[in-house]
Every structure is written in structure tokens, then in C-alpha cells.
Amino acid sequence: MRTILLTIAYDGTDYYGWQIQPDLPTVQGEIEKALHRVTGKEIHINGTGRTDRGVHAYGQCATFRIGDGIPTDRIAYALNNSLPGGIRIVSAEEKPEGFHARFDAKGKTYRYRLLLCGPHEDADGAPQAQRQLLYLRNYVYQVNRPLDLAAMRKAAAAMEGTHDFACFQAAGGEERETTVRTVYRVELTERCLEEGFFPEEESAHVLDIDVTGDGFLYNMVRIMAGTLVDVGSGRIGAADVPAVIESADREKAGHTAPPQGLYLMRVYFEEDFGHGEE
């Protein structure tokens, strides 16, 4: 039997998250159905992360066991021919026996994308950002107020390091032995989606929040992103963020940013964790 590691990209808009749910479309469910069509066998896959409904991925990973038959270098091609358009297998590689996508993961990078409110209006007097949201609404969190990016970067720096991140954990997730995690990097990058992306001659400004850590609590990145937005809008002081973390009190942190702005960018394993970016 071979152990196969898949790297997977998907648009989470039409799926009820990663994990299989009865009678609902999920990413895991679609991949397992594709595996059955390709191999004729019932094959269970184990994902690194259980992304929620509406969350996207560029670099989700999953492992499964398979016998002889389809060559490893043909698995991605075969599955992509059987999968819906919103799910793509980026790569498939054979790993040593016992390798597990979840338990052997050493870290992840997530990206949270904000659509910043545009200052200009079009000929009809409608803000450009409102029109842009028609095309981006499933992939960004639109923020309709100015943000103090310097304050947000100061707060982001306070989120780095090894801490008890209970303040950034939502209720309802899987029970954890500890809420202590190490966040290696929280980086904010302004980007412009250039003219030509939209039907009209306009561009969109986005702010990407990239978070790399050894593990994450339930909704942790979305709450971190919401907290940074609250810092940027003045609802939480940047200097108060260390005390918020120290409190371990969810009520003291910011709001939970919506799912559609979140992307799982990369999973790190022993051989590559800490040696690259997303």
C-alpha cells in the first residue's frame, strides 16, 4: 500500500466546509467521490485542516492509502478530470508509510484578505468598492471605514510569539489539551488588484494579513483578523492587545471576521517548515 499526500486548492463558496457532512456538499466528500470514480474503491482521506463553510485554500493537504494501480504521477490528473471546477489537486506525491497529513503537520500559513473602502466614486455616484464587491464578495471582507494601518501593524507584532491564545478561540470547536500556540509571523501587505481585472477601468485595494504558526485554535485567524480591524478603526487600542492576549478572555478580543476572506495558503511538514513562504 502507498501513502499519498495531496496538495489541494479550492473555492469554498459552494461547500459546507472541508469535513464530510451528511447530505451536504463538502470538499472532502467531493474528493472521496472522485477517488471512488477513479479507483472503484472506497477511500477515506485525512485533511490537515478542517476549513469552515466559505473558507478557501491554495495549499490544503490530505493523505490517503492506496494499493497498486494508478501511478502516483497520474493521480492529480485523474482526480482533476473527475472533480468539480471549484476543487483542484495541485500535486500528489508518495510519502513514507505512516505519514499523516494532520499529525505530521508542523505549521500552517493562513491569509486573511480585506477589501479596503475606495475613496473615489464612479460616474453614477456609487463608490467603486461597492461595484467591486459584486465580483469579490465571496473572496474578501469589505471594510467600509478608514483603517490605521500603522496601529494594525503594531498590534500584529504583539500577536507574534508563544502565548495562551484563548482570547482568539471561538466556542464550539474541537476540545484542545492546551490553548498555547506559537505564532511566528503576522504580516500585513497592501496590494492592488490592477485595472483589467474589473469590467470598468478601476482597481481595488486589498490588505492581506498573513499568519504563520505551529497550530491554530477554532476560528483563531478570523478573530485575529477581526481584532486587527477593530484596532485599525479605533475600537481597540494597539497598545491594549498584549493585555487582551494575557486576559485569555474572548470577550476582550475583537469580532470574528467572516469566513469568505480566509485562505489556507500552505501546510508545513518536517522537511520544509520554516524554509519558505506561501
For the regions a protein language model found, what residue spans apply to each?
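Structured-RNA-binding interfaces characteristic of tRNA pseudouridine synthases
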Residues: M1-E278
